[in-house]
Swiss-Prot record:
Residues 178-203 are annotated as: Disordered. Residues 13-157 form the HTH marR-type domain. GO terms for biological process: negative regulation of DNA-templated transcription; response to stress; sporulation resulting in formation of a cellular spore. Residues 178-195 have a biased composition (Basic and acidic residues). The gene is hpr. Homodimer. This is HTH-type transcriptional regulator Hpr. One of its GO terms (molecular function) is DNA-binding transcription factor activity. Negative regulator of protease production and sporulation. It comes from Bacillus velezensis (strain DSM 23117 / BGSC 10A6 / LMG 26770 / FZB42). PANTHER family: DNA-BINDING TRANSCRIPTIONAL REPRESSOR SCOC, TRANSCRIPTIONAL REGULATOR, MARR FAMILY.
Length: 203
């Protein structure tokens, strides 16, 4: 039986996948360190901050949505969400038209913490930002990473990318850059989707 040759060179495929793996690992090492340092004053870890981020964008996200868009196991999403609830940053709710699934929303305190983190973001402490400066100075913009975005889209799907792009749009709509810092826009000027009608769960 004749073996069908793949439409690519096997050695080329190995080199490409290893290049992606090793560069991604090196990049993540730097991202993880800077991300943790950013969160340290608030005593949050990366998973907790990611949950706050998704809850802010979706204005009522199910645990399965948190797991999917946060790229974490469902049990991880639930356990860290419970910890955030205990700290007063999240509340668990049910949708009036969906009693089966549990949804989470930011409390006022949780939203204040999330917004404070963004307002205190300092790009000079971010290695990826600093490492991209030569490209910015040469071309006048940061790398678009379109090819990487395409790869992620084919791995995680359109829903994942829609939330990713929506999160960037929301930050752009909700915040202004003033005097070298991010500032939350006033309610009149901010553009953000409202939450679906939810009812609280009694603990």
């Amino acid at each position: 039986m004749n073996r069908v040759e793949p439409p690519y060179d096997l050695k080329e495929a190995l080199i490409y996948t290893q290049k992606m793996a090793q560069l991604s690992k090196a990049l993540w090492k730097s991202i993880e360190k800077d991300w943790q340092n950013w969160l340290k004053p608030y005593d949050l870890n990366i998973n907790e901050h990611h949950i706050l981020w998704i809850a802010y964008q979706l204005k009522g996200a199910s645990i399965s949505e948190i797991a999917k868009f946060g790229v974490m196991h469902v049990s991880t999403a639930f356990n860290f969400s419970k910890k955030l609830e205990e700290r007063g940053y999240l509340k668990f709710s049910k949708r009036l038209n969906d009693k089966r699934n549990t949804y989470i929303q930011l409390t006022e305190e949780g939203e204040n913490v999330f917004e404070s983190l963004l307002e205190e973001f300092d790009p000079s402490r971010n290695a990826v930002f600093k490492g991209s400066q030569p490209i910015y100075h040469l071309f006048g913009k940061f790398p678009e990473v379109e090819e990487l975005t395409c790869v992620i889209r084919h791995i995680y799907g359109e829903d994942f990318m829609e939330i990713f792009e929506k999160s960037l749009t929301n930050i752009n709509n909700d915040f202004d850059s003033e005097d070298g810092r991010l500032k939350k826009k006033t309610d009149e000027s901010a553009v953000h989707e409202t939450a679906e009608e939810l009812e609280p769960i009694n603990s």
